[in-house]
């Protein structure tokens, strides 16, 4: 980071106004990585037309980067239905956020709506959040967009899907009526015999099942004894929301203690000596920075446990010092 700022100081952008946030390592490593950026704005992608199922990304209005000749360039970001990108000095479109990456994780249909400022981008017939497509640099587009055709409106897309569904339903009805025509033999009665269709019980009407069918590849839910029994971060992969919730149920439980710094330090020493088998690990005392509320004052200390039973045993057998409070929680990993 020091070498980057030293190079920036020798460039034509050295006299611009730079804040500590603009030149922090966190901003430098945020997408697009290894670049300086300013004026970030939020982009919201809503999946499956459900406002509760959405992701928020950052679009940077100003992006500063260094090319192969150690020359600094300034550009701006833009977005389309595929993701957020900027144009480099060679005219290449560089995507640093691909919406389909998270669509594979959070969307059932692989499609969503992109909301930015006053614009709403919806999928067209030939464009969608393509699950499994490669990310990175893209210079050309295929399909109707390459030929300059305009996208159909969301309403026309819904009408087309409705006509297609009605046509499929009508075709299925005709095939069922042909298969149900009575064929009487010497031993047949006056009532025609119908074979139940796949997935339907006899009688023709679909009945509710006592248990929800699990999709192939969905992991087995943990037992109560297994909840909180893992201390590593779940592997990020494309799976259903149910599979992610089951995977996260193994997250290790923790206790967050709040109190005076010296009180927490003494308690950690006593607990380590007297009750080392009743917890997994303890942190040092720490405080929140950039506090926006007086409720976040005071020192904190985290205690991690192997499972919920160990945490319950700790609370039942270890007495907290006076003035120390505890709240329960869980982490993705330790």
Curated annotation (Swiss-Prot):
Residues 229-240 have a biased composition (Polar residues). InterPro entries: E2/EBNA1_C_sf (IPR035975), Nucleotide-bd_a/b_plait_sf (IPR012677), Papillomavirus_E2_C (IPR000427), PPV_E2_N (IPR001866), Reg_prot_E2 (IPR033668), Regulatory_protein_E2_N (IPR036050), Regulatory_protein_E2_N_2 (IPR042504). One of its GO terms (molecular function) is DNA binding. Pfam families: PPV_E2_C, PPV_E2_N. Phosphorylated. Residues 1-127 are annotated as: Transactivation domain. Keywords: Activator, DNA replication, DNA-binding, Early protein, Host nucleus, Phosphoprotein, Repressor, Transcription, Transcription regulation. GO terms for cellular component: host cell nucleus. Residues 127-240 are annotated as: Disordered. GO terms for biological process: DNA replication; DNA-templated transcription; regulation of DNA replication; viral DNA genome replication. Its main location: host cell. Residues 251-334 are annotated as: DNA-binding domain. The keyword Ribonucleoprotein does not apply. The keyword DNA-binding applies. It is found in: Host nucleus. Binds DNA as homodimer. Interacts with protein E1; this interaction greatly increases E1 DNA-binding activity. Interacts with protein L1; this interaction enhances E2-dependent replication and transcription activation. Interacts with protein L2; this interaction inhibits E2 transcriptional activity but not DNA replication function E2. Interacts with protein E7; this interaction inhibits E7 oncogenic activity. Interacts with host TAF1; this interaction modulates E2-dependent transcriptional regulation. Interacts with host BRD4; this interaction mediates E2 transcriptional activation function. Plays a role in the initiation of viral DNA replication. A dimer of E2 interacts with a dimer of E1 in order to improve specificity of E1 DNA binding activity. Once the complex recognizes and binds DNA at specific sites, the E2 dimer is removed from DNA. E2 also regulates viral transcription through binding to the E2RE response element (5'-ACCNNNNNNGGT-3') present in multiple copies in the regulatory regions of the viral genome. Activates or represses transcription depending on E2RE's position with regards to proximal promoter elements including the TATA-box. Belongs to the papillomaviridae E2 protein family. This is Regulatory protein E2. It comes from Bos taurus papillomavirus 4. The gene is E2.
